[in-house]
């Protein structure tokens, strides 16, 4: 550098702006702060050049430039602060991001071009293949028609798939709704059954209404005569509605008499005497009169009587009104209890 300056001075080309540029550069590299105070190379230059005017002009220019740099901070200078470092890092990052974006754009364009080229090559192949195939039949198709048909088929296939998926979704929703309704119905049924069981088990007969008890008793006694089904948990109102067109049931006294006299034999001939036998038989050892013997009745399923065999026939209780006993036409001597043989005396009972 010194040689260049000396060469310029000796050659007569005194270029002050070049010297100022050199001084400014040296000041930036050697001293980062203010340029006041001078440097040892300034003395060396003045001694080496041995020119008074040049030294004065050089010093004044150097001082002016240093003063201006002190007042106005340089845009290119680096003073070692954190802000400047961060700015430099940001600029480098932006530059790198810009490079990355440019590379991505290039690759994207390259992919697009490659896709277009491949589509064009495929189109050419399809055209040649179709033309070669249809050349025998005298037909000639273009690639556009073939691609149009392919696109139509793809659209139809996609539409069918969409319809199937919609039908499946609708079916799933319907099944879900049906399942929800079924669950609700089952829960309601369970609650209704629980309520019925609770009221059926918890309410005692003494806590029910007397009308309900009377109707239930009538239904229990006359279910066969009325032809109605009998449920013990029927209410009085329901049973009355069902029995609206039926004849009124008989009273309790008549029903008891009917139940006690429900024998298969006619009421006017409960005990009939046997015909007289000509020859003596095994019945002669019986000491009972002949007119009190009974016909042997056929065996029935209700013969499990728990009464002893000697008390099969018991005397009837005396009845005060004569109208009740008028229909009994049996002789009075056969009403009393007599010791009969247990195998020859069988009574049937409904």
Swiss-Prot record:
UniProt xrefs under InterPro entries: NPIP, NPIP_N
Region (Disordered): 306-325
Pfam families xrefs: NPIP (PF06409)
Source species, domain of life: Eukaryota
Coiled coil stretches, renumbered: none
Family (UniProt): Belongs to the NPIP family.
Protein name listed in UniProt: Nuclear pore complex-interacting protein family member A3
The organism of origin for this protein: Homo sapiens
Taxonomic classification: Eukaryota, Metazoa, Chordata, Craniata, Vertebrata
């Amino acid at each position: 550098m010194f040689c260049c300056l000396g060469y310029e001075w000796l050659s007569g080309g005194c270029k002050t702006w070049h010297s100022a540029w050199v001084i400014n550069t040296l000041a930036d590299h050697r001293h980062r702060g203010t340029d006041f105070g001078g440097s040892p190379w300034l003395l060396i230059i003045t001694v080496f050049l041995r020119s008074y005017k040049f030294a004065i002009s050089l010093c004044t220019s150097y001082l002016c430039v240093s003063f201006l740099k002190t007042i106005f901070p340089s845009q290119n200078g680096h003073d070692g602060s954190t802000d400047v470092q961060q700015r430099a890092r940001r600029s480098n990052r932006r530059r790198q991001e810009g490079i990355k974006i440019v590379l991505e754009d290039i690759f994207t364009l390259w992919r697009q071009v490659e896709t277009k080229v491949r589509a064009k090559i495929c189109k050419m192949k399809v055209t040649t293949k179709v033309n070669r195939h249809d050349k025998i039949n005298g037909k000639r198709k273009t690639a556009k028609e073939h691609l149009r048909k392919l696109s139509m088929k793809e659209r139809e296939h996609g539409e069918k798939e969409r319809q199937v998926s919609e039908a499946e979704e609708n079916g799933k929703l319907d099944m879900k709704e049906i399942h929800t309704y079924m669950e609700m119905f089952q829960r309601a049924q369970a609650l209704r059954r629980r309520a019925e069981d609770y009221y059926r088990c918890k309410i005692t007969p003494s806590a029910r209404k007397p009308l309900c008890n009377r109707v239930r008793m009538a239904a229990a006694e006359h279910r066969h005569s009325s032809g109605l089904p009998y449920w013990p948990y029927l209410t009085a109102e329901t049973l009355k509605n069902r029995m609206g067109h039926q004849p009124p049931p008989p009273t309790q006294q008549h029903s008891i008499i009917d139940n006690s006299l429900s024998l298969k034999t006619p009421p006017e001939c409960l005990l009939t005497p046997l015909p007289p036998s000509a020859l003596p038989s095994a019945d002669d050892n019986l000491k009972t009169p002949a007119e009190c013997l009974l016909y042997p009745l056929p065996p029935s399923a209700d013969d499990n009587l728990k009464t002893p065999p000697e008390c099969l026939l018991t005397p009837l209780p005396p009845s005060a009104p004569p109208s009740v006993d008028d229909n009994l036409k049996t002789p009075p001597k056969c009403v009393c209890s007599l010791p009969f043989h247990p195998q020859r005396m069988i009574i049937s009972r409904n």
